[in-house]
Amino acid sequence: MNDTFMKTRPVFPLLLSMALPNVISMLVNSLYNIVDSLFVARISEQAMTALSLVYPIQNFVNAVAIGFGVGINVQIALYLGAGDREQANRSATHGMAFSLLHGVLAMILCPAIMPGFLARFTDDSTLVSMGVTYSTIVFLFTLVNMADLAFEKIFQAVGRMNVSMVALVAGCVSNIMLDPILIFGLGPVPALGIAGAALATGIGQAVTLCVYLYVYCTTELPVRLSFPQLRPDAALDGKLYAIGIPAILNLALPSLLVTFLNSLLAAFSQSYVTVLGIYYKLQTFLYLPANGIVQGMRPLVGYNYGAKEHGRVAKLYNLTLGLSAGIMAIGTLLCLTVSGPLMSLFTSNPETIAIGRTALRIICLGFIVSAVSTTSSGALEGLGKGMSSLVISLCRYVIFIMPIAWLLCGRMGPTGVWHAFWITEVLSAAIAYGVYCPAQCAQSNP
C-alpha cells in the first residue's frame, strides 16, 4: 500500500481527509460520553458526582494509553516518511507490546487505590461506594482499552483514519445501546445501576478491538506487527518513550488539575464539583473538532518532517491553527448563548444549573486563544519534540492555572476558579507561540 500521498497531495484537502474521520469518531465518542452521563444522571445526582470524582484517575489511564500511542504514531510516521519500513514495523510491534504491559499494570493498580482516593474528596459513604463500583469494573477492561488505542495510533500513522472512525463508532454505538439496558434493566437483564454503565463501557471497548483485529487481519498495511521484531532495541524504545512520556504527561495533567480544583471547590459545595465534572464532559464535545484536526495534522507533520518537506510542515501548522480558532469561536458562541440549556441536560437541580451557567460563560472566554496552544503542542509532537510540547501543557495545567485559581478562589470564591481558566489560556498561548516558532525555524534550517 502506497503511503506517499501524505507528502504529495495538496495540504488543505489532505488535512481535511485525515481530520474528518477523526472528528467524526471523536464526535461519536463525545456523544457517547454525554449520553452515558445523561443515563447516569437519571440514577441520581450522587451518581453523577461519583463519576466526576472518578474522572481524574480514569483520565490518567486514558492519558497513558493515548500519550504512549502518540509516541507509536510519530515514530511510525517518521520512519515511513524516511522510507525505513523495517523500523516502522519494529516501532509498531514494540509500541503494542508496551501498551499491553501498561494495561496489565493499570488493571492491577487502579482498583487498589480507588477507595482511598475517593475518600480524600468526600466523607459520603454512598458516593465512595458508587465510585468504587464504577471504577472497579471500568479498570477490568484497561488491557482492552490500551490495545484499542495502540491500534488507533498505528492506523492513523499510515493514513487509515477511516478504520479508526469505524472501530470507534462501532464501540460507541454498542455502548449507547447497552447503557439503558444494563443501567435500568430490560426483560431478564437486571438493573445494575452505575455498575451497568461501567460494564457497557467495557463491552463497547471490546467491540472496538474486534473491529481493529478484523481489519488488521484482512487488509494490507504499510506496517505489520511481528513477534521476531520484539528483540531488545533500547534506542527505539527510548525514542518511543521520549515522545510518549511527555505526551502522557500532557494528557495526564488535566487529571492533576481536576483533582486540585475539586479540592478547592469541595470546600464550598458538592454542586461546584458536579459543575466542574459536567464542564469537562462538555469541553470534550466542544473541543473535539479542533482536536480532531490536530490529530490529523500530527502524523502529516511527522511524515513530511521525515521526508524533509519543511515547507509543507509550516503550511500544515498555519492551516490547522486557523481552522481550530474558527471552530473554537463557535464553541464560545454556544457557551455564551445556551449555557443554561447545556447544563440542564445533566441535572435538574436549579442551584447546579445556575452555577454551571456562570461557569461556562466565564470559562469560554479563553476558547479561541487556546487554539494556539493545542496546535503548537500537536505540531511539536509531530516533530518529535515531546519535551517542548510538555512545556506548553505544564503552563496550561499547572504553572499558571493552579496558583491563579488558588489566589482568585481566596478573593472571589468559586467564581475565581472559573476566571483562572481564560487567564491561563491567554498566558499559555503566548508561551506556546514562543516555544513553537524557534522549533519550526530550527527544523526548516537544519
Protein language model annotation of sequence segments:
Residues 60-63, 107, 175-180, 209-213, ...:
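Hydrophobic transmembrane alpha-helices of multi-pass small-molecule transporters
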Residues 39-59, 125-130, 194-196, 236-243, ...:
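Interfacial/gating helices of multi-pass transporter permease domains
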Residues 27, 31-49, 118-125, 181-192, ...:
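Helix-terminus/linker motif at the lipid-water interface of multi-pass membrane proteins
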Residues 17-36, 137, 171, 204-208, ...:
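Transmembrane helical elements of multi-pass membrane transporters/channels
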Residues 48-108, 145-159, 163-164, 262, ...:
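Small-residue-rich hydrophobic transmembrane alpha-helices
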Residues 69, 73, 138-156, 164-172, ...:
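Short runs within selected transmembrane alpha-helices of multi-pass transporters and secretion channels
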Residues 1-19, 76-143, 189-245, 301-366, ...:
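Short alpha-helical transmembrane segments in multi-pass integral membrane proteins
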Residues 8, 12-31, 35, 57-64, ...:
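Residue-level signal for short hydrophobic patches within transmembrane helices
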